[in-house]
């Protein structure tokens, strides 16, 4: 049997990935992923993270965001992270492997958070994409709705929420809901986010809960 050839789209993605300046920088600096630079740019603009904070990181693997946040909140801070994929340990991060859509996993995560409210909830969750927007966008919107539900359960008054959202059906309604719950809401497209991608980051501060 002959070798299977990669599709044009997967070959293009690989070429883009390995020539991406942020992928190269992440490799040189021994960072978990290029996502580190996305949250860094958001922090430079929006100043979300401070020493001693407690942060929930959803869709954490391979750990770029958690790695960055630990550097901002210091030894007295705490990150509680969750992902369906494995993640190598990071000092200062309490990691739970499991599917966030599973109620048992959600309950285990809430148990780790404990009684005290958290300062920031952040979500970089994304579904496995099929290439069909009619399938992918609803899957992605379901995940961001779950992330917002998490905010409603654990986020402290005046807390912050950062969430990756893919523009498409349901985006405007989701943005409206967030604006009803937070005092200040911005839509960011960090430089490290690929231009072709539909992803944007909603940064919401001043939770009214």
Curated annotation (Swiss-Prot):
User: Can you state which reaction this protein catalyses?
Assistant: uridine(2552) in 23S rRNA + S-adenosyl-L-methionine = 2'-O-methyluridine(2552) in 23S rRNA + S-adenosyl-L-homocysteine + H(+)
- The answer to keyword Methyltransferase applying to this record is yes
Positions contributing to S-adenosyl-L-methionine binding: 63, 65, 83, 99, 124
All copies of domain TRAM, residue ranges = 191-209
Q: Which UniProt keywords apply?
A: Cytoplasm, Methyltransferase, rRNA processing, S-adenosyl-L-methionine, Transferase
This enzyme's EC code(s)? 2.1.1.166
Name the residues that span the membrane. none
NCBIfam families the record matches: PRK11188.1, rrmJ
Descriptive protein name: Ribosomal RNA large subunit methyltransferase E
């Amino acid at each position: 049997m002959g070798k299977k050839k990669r599709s044009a789209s997967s070959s293009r993605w690989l070429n883009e990935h390995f020539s991406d300046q942020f992928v190269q920088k992440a490799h040189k600096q021994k960072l978990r992923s290029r996502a580190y630079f996305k949250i860094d740019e958001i922090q430079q603009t929006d100043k979300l993270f401070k020493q001693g904070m407690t942060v929930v990181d959803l869709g954490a693997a391979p750990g770029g965001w958690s790695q960055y946040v630990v550097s901002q909140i210091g030894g007295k801070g705490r990150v509680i992270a969750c992902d369906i994929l494995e993640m190598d340990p990071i000092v200062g991060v309490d990691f739970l492997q499991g599917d966030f859509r599973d109620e048992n996993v959600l309950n285990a995560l809430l148990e780790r958070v404990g009684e005290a409210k958290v300062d920031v909830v952040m979500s970089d969750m994304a579904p496995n994409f099929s290439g069909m927007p009619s399938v992918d966008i609803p899957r992605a919107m379901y995940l961001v709705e779950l992330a917002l539900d998490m905010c409603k359960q654990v986020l402290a008054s005046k807390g912050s929420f950062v969430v990756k959202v893919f523009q498409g059906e349901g985006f405007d309604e989701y943005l409206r809901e967030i604006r009803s719950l937070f005092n200040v809401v911005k839509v960011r497209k960090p430089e490290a986010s690929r231009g072709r991608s539909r992803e944007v980051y909603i940064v919401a501060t001043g939770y009214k809960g």
